[in-house]
UniProtKB/Swiss-Prot annotation:
Protein family per UniProt: Belongs to the RNA polymerase beta' chain family.
Residues the entry annotates as binding Mg(2+): D746, D748, D750
Gene that produces this protein: rpoC
Entries under CDD domains matching the protein: RNAP_beta'_C, RNAP_beta'_N
Gene Ontology CC terms, in alphabetical order: DNA-directed RNA polymerase complex
Catalyses which reaction(s): RNA(n) + a ribonucleoside 5'-triphosphate = RNA(n+1) + diphosphate
Species, as recorded: Deinococcus geothermalis (strain DSM 11300 / CIP 105573 / AG-3a)
Subunit (UniProt): The RNAP catalytic core consists of 2 alpha, 1 beta, 1 beta' and 1 omega subunit. When a sigma factor is associated with the core the holoenzyme is formed, which can initiate transcription.
Function: DNA-dependent RNA polymerase catalyzes the transcription of DNA into RNA using the four ribonucleoside triphosphates as substrates.
Name used for this protein in its record: DNA-directed RNA polymerase subunit beta'
Length: 1537
């Protein structure tokens, strides 16, 4: 026994992983190819994991056990057993944290749930495609504060961290549509068809042209005519100077060369320079004349003019005004009218082309000073120097940069440098007068004297598991719990559901003591090397476990990352390497869970990761923990052993020699045949030379032993039984023919396994509990499973059959003499039924009257009569009309019963021909009346006699034994006539094709039945002793369908889809099939083969699921004390006719046999069966007889039991395999699962097609229906059910019915009608009264609807009845209680509708007892939790179980282990599977604590200890010896010796 009672699973912290480890694995090397020794610091390092050779260090300095525990100073290896390499672990320290993929990819993701991230978001962070904000500080995004835990794309991160700027290239020669330094908005055109994608500051890059607008001014004269009056002293651009009344000319005041200065529009300033100068353009200015807009210039540039020459003209009515690009000031009016002096101001624009090697030194719109360098260049001559003060404008930039920035022009020194980060209000320049308005990064343009602050923020955001770990590290679970509890009060159901999921995870972490950050690995444990071995194969190559490849990949990447970090590699490379490390960790833990799996080089086989080692049929749980290979076992072909007793099996000598070797050694040593084990081993080495003394010793060894025989598949507990071994020659195991049915074995090459229970306790348990003779009744239905069959039935039936002659049948005679005379004359035969003096008899009974059975048997031996002839025999003073064979059979049974032979008449009826069922009833009667020993003896006697009789009867089949009925031809001709009529009606359009098809199928079904009846009538009337007929009638072999096909007609066949082919096979096998008929047959045959294969797999899986859901249900208490009961109706009343219909006897039996009554039942004979009594078969038969008067009985069922994870004896009732109250510790859950699953293969796969009838739908039947019910699935064709009690009101529309249910109280009537399609057939009429949950249409009811609209009881009864309907349709008998045990497990969970003041959350699914426990624990005045029942399918129910070990070994191993470790779940080891996995005794049967604590004592011991009284427990039948001492001793016969 292991000394622990609970097992807890939790997440390992990095510290715990290092604590497990014996050293760090730093290198990916495994073993040296030359020395074949492990490499240091590698995956097989002896310093870390221990020595390869027992008690020997790596260098060989220390050898032998005397140095145990010493660490070699040369090689560093500890001297110890090499077994340590199976459990010593290592570790790998990761260069960067990596997430555990189970907590990432589980649904819902545990890490994602805690951090409120979706699975996709979490994946983006972990695999380096998004940043996770770990510290937002004052960062803003889209005008709101950045949140912690928010995701940022690469671009978003760069924009927020370093500022966003985008460069837009303009096509060559395109003029910009915005100014340099202008703020632009998203969507604004920048130039050509280039549009800005963001708001921000636009800045030119590489302008191709620059234009400087120089501000010019000069004094000039404005000669106007005397009649023009100028009254202002200044004129603005565009202002009117004068309106002319007559023509005007302006003339040159002096001689000179004219130079024209453009002042915009057509206004000019004419400079007259000295013509005598060498270069007139450089000559002295003699005069300047201002010519306003509106005058026509009459002089050309560089023209020499004389004083008085016309410079410009204007016509009368013209307006003179100042040009728009100039203005006039200091207008002086002379005394003499006409010549006005003015100062003219104008802008002179000069354009400069900027080549690529040149660069602008000032910004667009900047003012320039005369002599200032405006454009720099490599070549000094290309530089642009300002000719005068002016303003520069830049044109045609190569590109425009738009950035989120603010530009500040400064005068004084800046107070910041490039790259500095500033916050709002920080000083930038001008002694603190210039301050930043935003957060950002500083860029200083010293040339333009600008400080540019690019909007960005100093915040923390990271990628990968490192970022996630930081958030998990900082999680405040208490605060988060408070926030989520608040969210649970939200009105939104969706928000509450989301909060509940998160709150469950938060509370799980709080209660378990796990820290959320442990879901991120800093250290990876390395499995012990002997669990991931590397072995040398032929050819010098190595075969290695996939894990080594995965570890090697991880170590390589880890080392490479460490190296790159040490070298200061670029961020991009390191990021990629970190992602690859995360993927390597993922592949090690669960290969293929994300992305494509890592495969073997050169093949498509994906490597088996740690997860693959656990899950699936070949995983650790199912392969190694639940199913272990055992020693002391053998396997061989089985052959029949007709000479064996029921409790015996034949074991080949050679096999026994090997199986019992240790015991044999001991006996040989005791006998002095050998002196030591070595000698004994040598003695047994050569089988052929084995001495007789060894065989004698072997006989002695096996004398009091039993062995277990097992045939796969073990579908129920009778698949393993104990037998006493008998040594036989040959190499085959011999099996008793009668146990074949339990094993489902036959002798066509079946093999069986044999096991030896080793300890005395195991031997005792096997002998008492598992001996074949002690398992005569089936646990599924309580009927004998060991019963005569095949040849045995044939022999006994032949013996006890009565011959019937037809010669002179029905003749009447006045007296016996006349009858005997007629016999002598041959008018009647010996066994002809005749009447003598009005009494029915036969000539044989008149002629042969024997005074004793011996006399009759002697007459048979003399050949006077046959065993089957009618005779009269005196027996115990009474004369019986019977046959010699029946008397002979009575004697056989009497001899078999031995000492109890006087009770033979309670078993044998001389009026019966013993066929299959009557023999079964006889075995059952013997079991009940005389017990196990007598029944086993009787069965052996029947076997011996049956085989002998069937042999000497000489019954065999020849082709002539298949007799065709004489009227078959007439029946077929009649059918053809009807067929012609149907076809004619169809041709005339009186019916649809569907109706024709249905009628044709029905016609041939009826005809086939008629032919079958004709076959049977022909056999029974004319050939009563026909071998084929005898075999069929006795139940030995062949059913009516097979006889029909042999001698009648094959009939209709099925298509592969299950529908019927309307062309029948008219021939029988005796006549032979035509080619077409043979072809049609092949359809059905193939479908049968395919169905069987599918059924076997589905049935096995169903059994596995059933065992899983119910394995913990064990009888744990005598009486749970419940007052609940279940009403079992014994019949139904037809609603329309009011007629009572009693249920079939077999149905009543499977419903109430072995149940505890909760109310008295009064029988018509005045007998009362009291409440509290368990119903025996006799009680059930009596109740069935009075079913109509009784109506219904009230019984306890497992559905009402209050015992947690089990049932009590009273609620369960009888153990059907013992026909007595169930024992404490009986694993009734497993028995239930096996009882339902074992016959699963017999169920059909068929979905009955209704031949395409509209609205008929497909009715799922057989195995798929059973699976559908146990999985609580929505049926394919679902019935609409009433949602309340009331009266049905139906309105008909074109395509549907509107159904409303009116309740008695108007307030409860349905407001909106149910819309029912006309394709669903209504089964209620307008005005019918219905109850909630009653179906309104054809189809199967959805059990969830029953639970919703009615109650738990209705759902339970429906599930039980529907499963039974399928089993009964196939003739399989299963007791209701087995189905109830499973249904109870499906309904053990509830959904919380309001948590009240408990810790339970709305929407949570928990076991019912948990809610009761939580509510009971509340102090007074607090609100208890409320709930509603939920129906879970068996798969869901198995996975929801409290036992994580059981759930993980069932399905979805990773999900179960993820959940359990997060919750720090404790397995209380209540069920069977958990204990099998841990190698503990299962808590059932003899392993149950209460049973193990019982002490078995004999009378003498009791007297010695002074016991005073003996009392018998009414329920268990166990005797208790009560005493004043606290440790009373009790005996339970079920487990005693």
């Amino acid at each position: 026994m292991k000394d622990f009672s609970k097992v807890r699973i939790a997440i390992a912290s990095p510290a715990k992983i290092r604590e497990w480890s014996f050293g760090e694995v730093e290198k990916p090397e495994t073993i040296n190819y030359r020395t074949l020794k492990p490499e240091r610091e590698g995956l097989f390092d002896e310093r870390i994991f221990g020595p390869i050779k027992d008690y020997e260090c790596a260098c060989g300095k220390y050898k032998r056990q005397r140095y145990e525990g010493k660490v070699c100073e040369r090689c560093g290896v500890e001297v110890t057993s090499s077994k340590v390499r199976r459990y010593r672990m290592g570790h790998i320290d990761l260069a960067t944290p990596a997430a555990h993929i189970w907590y990432v990819k589980d649904t819902p993701s545990k890490i994602g749930t805690l951090l409120d991230l979706s699975a996709a978001q979490l994946e983006k962070v972990l695999y380096f495609s998004s940043f996770l904000v770990t510290d937002p500080r004052n960062a803003q995004k889209d005008g709101r504060p950045l949140r912690r835990g928010e995701l940022l794309s690469d671009d978003e991160y760069r924009e927020l961290r370093f500022g966003r700027q985008e460069t837009y290239t303009l096509p060559s020669g395109t003029e910009a549509a915005v100014r340099d330094g202008e703020y632009v908005t998203r969507g604004q055109v920048l130039g050509g068809n280039v549009v800005s994608k963001m708001d921000g500051l636009a800045q030119y890059r590489f302008p191709r042209r620059a234009e400087i607008a120089y501000a010019e001014e000069a004094e000039a004269s404005l000669p106007l005519p005397s009649d023009v009056l100028v009254q202002q002293d200044s004129f603005r651009p565009g202002e009117i100077l004068a309106e002319l009344e007559g023509d005007v000319q302006i003339t040159a005041p002096v001689d000179g060369t004219a130079f024209l200065l453009d002042m915009g529009e057509d206004s000019v300033l004419v400079e007259l320079r000295d013509s005598a100068a060498e270069d007139a353009a450089q000559g002295e200015v003699l005069a300047r004349v201002y010519i306003p807009h509106g005058m026509n210039v009459q002089v050309a540039e560089g023209e020499v003019v004389e004083a008085g020459s016309v410079l410009a003209t204007a016509a009368a009515g013209d307006r003179l005004r100042v040009s728009r690009d100039s203005r006039l000031s200091n207008v002086n009016f002379p005394k003499k009218k006409g010549d006005v002096k003015v100062t003219a101001h104008w802008t002179r624009r000069v354009e400069y082309r900027i080549e690529p090697q040149m660069h602008v030194l000032v910004g667009d719109g900047s003012e320039v000073r005369k002599g200032q360098k405006v454009v720099g260049a490599i070549d000094k001559e290309e530089e642009v120097i300002a000719e005068a003060d002016g303003v520069i404008t830049l044109h045609a930039p190569a590109s425009i940069i738009v950035s989120k920035a603010r530009v500040y022009a400064y005068q004084d020194e800046p107070l910041v440098v490039n790259g500095d980060r500033v916050e709002p209000g920080d000083e930038l320049a001008d002694s603190g007068n210039l301050r930043s308005e935003i957060s950002g990064r500083v860029e200083i343009d010293l040339v333009r004297k600008q400080v540019r602050v690019i909007e960005s923020y100093d915040f923390e955001a990271k990628m990968g598991a490192e970022a996630v770990k930081e958030l998990l590290d900082d999680l405040d679970l208490d605060q988060l719990e408070a926030e989520l509890s608040e969210q649970m009060k939200d009105n939104s159901r969706h928000k509450r559901a989301k909060a509940r999921k998160r709150l469950e995870v938060v509370r799980a972490f709080k209660r378990s003591g796990n820290h959320p950050s442990w879901m991120i690995l800093e250290t990876v444990p390395v499995m012990p090397p002997d669990l991931r071995p590397m072995v040398q194969v032929d050819g010098g190559r190595f075969a290695t476990s996939d894990l080594n490849d995965l570890y090697r990949r991880l170590i390589n990447r880890n080392n490479r990352l460490k190296k790159l970090i040490g070298q200061g590699a670029p961020d991009m490379i390191i990021r990629n390497e970190k992602r690859m490390l995360q993927e390597a960790v993922d592949a090690l833990i669960d290969n293929g869970r994300r992305g494509s799996p890592v495969t073997n080089p050169g093949s498509d086989r994906s490597l088996r990761s740690l997860t693959d080692l656990l899950g699936g049929k070949q995983g650790r749980f199912r392969q190694n923990l639940l199913g272990k290979r055992v020693d002391y076992s053998g396997r061989s072909v089985i052959v029949v052993g007709p000479q064996l007793k029921l409790h015996q099996c034949g074991v080949p000598k050679r096999m026994a020699l090997e199986l019992f070797k240790p015991f044999l050694f001991k006996v040989l040593e005791e006998k002095g045949e050998v002196t030591n084990i070595k000698q004994a081993r040598k003695m047994l080495e050569r089988y052929r030379d084995t001495r007789d003394s060894v065989w004698d010793a072997l006989e002695e060894v096996i004398e009091d032993k039993v062995v277990l025989l097992n045939r796969a598949p073990t579908l129920h507990r009778l698949g393993i039984q104990a037998f006493e071994p008998v040594l036989v020659e040959g190499q085959s195991i011999q099996l008793h023919p009668l146990v074949c049915e339990a094993f489902n074995a036959d002798f066509d090459g079946d093999q069986m396994a044999i096991h030896v229970p080793l300890s005395a306790q195991a031997q005792a348990e096997a002998r008492i509990q598992m001996l074949s003779a002690h398992n005569l009744l089936s646990p599924a239905n309580g009927e004998p499973n060991v019963k005569p069959s095949r040849d045995i039935i044939l022999g006994i039936f032949t013996l006890t059959q009565l011959r019937k002659d037809n010669l002179g049948a029905g003749s009447e005679f006045a007296n016996e003499q006349d009858a005997l005379k007629a016999l002598d004359e041959g008018r009647v035969a010996l066994n002809t039924p005749i009447r003598v003096n009005g009494v029915e008899t036969s000539p044989g009974r008149l002629k042969y009257v024997f005074s004793s059975p011996d006399e009759a048997i002697m007459a048979v031996d003399r050949g006077e009569i046959d065993y089957q002839d009618h005779v009269r025999i005196r027996l115990n003073g009474t004369v019986y009309e019977t046959s010699a064979g029946r008397v002979m059979f009575r004697r056989l049974v009497q001899e078999a019963l031995g000492a109890q032979g006087h009770l033979v008449d309670t078993l044998v009826n001389l009026d019966t021909a013993y066929e299959k069922d009557s023999l079964k009833d006889m075995v059952m009667a013997c079991y009940k009346e005389l017990g196990i020993e007598a029944t086993a003896g009787l069965l052996d006697a029947l076997k011996d006699s049956g085989f002998k009789l069937s042999t000497i009867s000489g019954i065999t089949i020849g082709i002539d034994d298949i007799v065709l009925p004489p009227n078959k031809r007439e029946l077929l001709a009649e059918a053809d006539e009807k067929l012609a009529a149907i076809e004619q009606n169809y041709e005339f359009g009186f019916m649809t094709d569907e109706e024709r098809y249905k009628q044709v199928v029905q016609l041939w079904n009826d005809t086939t039945d008629e032919v079958k009846n004709a076959v049977f009538e022909n056999f029974s009337r004319n050939y009563p002793f026909n071998p084929l007929w005898i075999m069929s009638q006795s139940g030995a072999r062949g059913n009516p369908q097979q006889i029909r096909q042999l001698a009648g007609m094959r009939g209709l066949m099925a298509r592969p889809d299950g529908s019927t082919i309307e062309v029948p096979i008219r021939a029988s096998f005796r006549e032979g099939l035509t080619v077409l008929e043979y072809f049609i047959s092949t359809h059905g045959a193939r479908k049968g083969g395919a169905d069987t294969a599918l059924r076997t797999a589905d049935s096995g899986y169903l059994t596995r699921k059933l065992v899983d859901v119910a394995h913990e249900v064990v009888v744990r208490d005598v009486d749970c004390g419940t007052t609940d009961y279940t009403v079992m109706p014994l019949g139904t009343t037809d609603e329309r006719t009011g007629e009572w219909r009693t249920r079939k006897g077999s149905e009543i039996e499977t419903a109430i046999y072995g149940r505890t009554l909760t109310a008295d039942v009064e029988l018509s004979d005045g007998r009362v069966i009291p409440a509290g009594q368990m119903l025996s078969l006799e009680d059930v038969k009596a109740i069935t007889r009075d079913a109509k008067a009784i109506g219904e009985v009230f019984v306890r069922t497992p559905l009402n039991c209050r015992v947690r994870a089990g049932v009590c004896q009273k609620c369960y009732g009888y153990d059907l395999s013992q026909a007595k109250p169930v024992s404490l510790g009986e694993a009734v859950g497993v028995v239930a699962a096996e009882s339902i699953g074992e016959p699963g293969t017999q169920l059909t796969m068929r979905t009955f097609h209704t031949g395409g009838v509209a609205g008929g739908g497909d009715i799922t039947m057989g195995l798929p229906r059973v699976i559908e019910l146990f999985e609580a699935r929505k049926p394919k064709t679902q019935a609409v059910v009433a949602d309340r009690d009331g009266v049905v009101r139906i309105e008909e529309e074109e395509e549907r019915y509107l159904v409303r249910i009116e309740a008695e109280d108007e307030a409860f009537s349905s407001k909106t009608p149910m819309k029912i399609s006309k394709s669903l057939r209504l089964i209620v009429r307008d005005g019918d009264h219905v109850e909630a949950g009653q179906p309104l249409t054809r189809g199967a009811i959805n059990p969830h609807d029953l639970l919703l609209y009615k109650d738990t009881d209705a759902a339970q009864r429906y599930l039980v009845e529907e499963v039974q309907r399928v089993y009964r349709s196939q003739g399989v008998k299963v007791h209701d209680k087995h189905i109830e045990v499973i249904v109870r497990q499906m309904l053990r969970y509830v959904e919380i509708t309001d948590g009240g003041d408990t810790d339970l959350l709305e929407g949570q699914t928990v076991e019912r007892w948990e809610v009761d426990q939580a509510n009971d624990a509340l102090p007074e005045g607090k609100t208890p939790a409320s709930w509603k029942p939920v129906l879970l399918g068996i798969t869901k129910s198995s996975l929801t179980t409290k036992s994580w070990l059981s759930a993980a070994s069932f399905q979805h191993t990773t999900h179960v282990l993820t959940e359990a470790s997060m919750r720090g779940q404790v397995d209380e080891l209540i069920g069977l599977k958990e204990n099998v996995i841990l190698g503990k005794l299962i808590p059932a049967g003899t392993g149950l604590t209460t049973v193990r604590e019982m002490q078995v004592a004999d009378e003498r011991t009791l007297e010695k200890y002074g016991q005073t009284s003996v009392s018998t427990d009414a329920v268990t039948g166990s005797q208790r010896y009560d005493d004043t001492r606290p440790s009373s001793t009790s005996i339970n016969p079920s487990y005693g010796d």
